[in-house]
């Protein structure tokens, strides 16, 4: 509803303000990346399956290294990406979450067979307040701030986000973070 949408916008603006002024507090600790991604999957799955009739799959490699960071913020970023996949995939679509590691990094990929993003819009996705399709975003509650916030949070964790998409076919989002050094 409109009250929830306005609350979400205010929360996003407060988060951006904290980022801009270096006031965003991070609760840094060692945590299981695999467990964090599993938490996001479990939290999103019910909505995806019951409200949108999506097939939602989760694959997780064995022995993914831990991460040093703010678990809540990382889960917030991944939930934003998964929520976008749910919102912009027509009912009955498929969303996959894949967590793994490569070298000294961990990653999560979120892929969907949704509506995709036009190629001309890809370079602007991380701009504040940029929305690919304003009517579509307004209908689904988009503010144009989520991806900007996600990139800022990941940057503070020395991580990155990459988005590939084909309009009409779907989107592939990859988040990469440095793995924590092995415990002694």
Show which residues each predicted segment covers.
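Conserved catalytic submotifs in the C-terminal HATPase_c
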Residues: 27-32, 55-65
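Short beta-strand/loop element within the Bergerat-fold HATPase_c
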Residues: 92-104
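Short helix-loop "hinge" at the ATP-lid/N-box region of the Bergerat-fold HATPase_c
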Residues: 85-86
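Short helix N-cap motif at coil->helix boundaries in the Bergerat
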Residues: 33, 116-127
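Conserved micro-motifs of the catalytic ATP-binding
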Residues: 21-26, 66-69
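Short alpha-helical segment of the dimerization/phosphotransfer core of two-component systems
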Residues: 1-6
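Conserved glycine-rich
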Residues: 158-159
């Amino acid at each position: 509803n409109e009250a929830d949408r306005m609350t979400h916008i205010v929360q996003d603006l407060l988060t951006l303000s904290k980022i801009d002024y270096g006031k965003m507090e991070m609760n840094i600790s060692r945590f299981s990346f695999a467990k964090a991604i599993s938490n996001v999957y479990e939290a999103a799955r019910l909505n995806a399956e019951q409200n949108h009739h999506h097939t939602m799959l989760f694959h997780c490699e064995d022995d993914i290294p831990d991460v040093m960071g703010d678990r809540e913020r990382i889960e917030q970023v991944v939930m934003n990406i998964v929520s976008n996949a749910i919102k912009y995939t027509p009912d009955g679509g498929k969303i996959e979450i894949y967590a793994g590691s490569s070298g000294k990094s961990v990653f999560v990929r979120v892929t969907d067979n949704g509506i995709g993003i036009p190629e001309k819009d890809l370079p602007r996705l991380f701009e504040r307040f940029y929305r690919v399709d304003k009517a579509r975003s307004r209908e689904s509650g988009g503010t144009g701030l989520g991806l900007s916030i996600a990139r800022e949070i990941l940057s503070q964790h020395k991580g990155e986000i990459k988005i590939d998409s084909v309009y009409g076919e779907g989107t592939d989002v990859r988040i990469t973070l440095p793995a924590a050094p092995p415990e002694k």
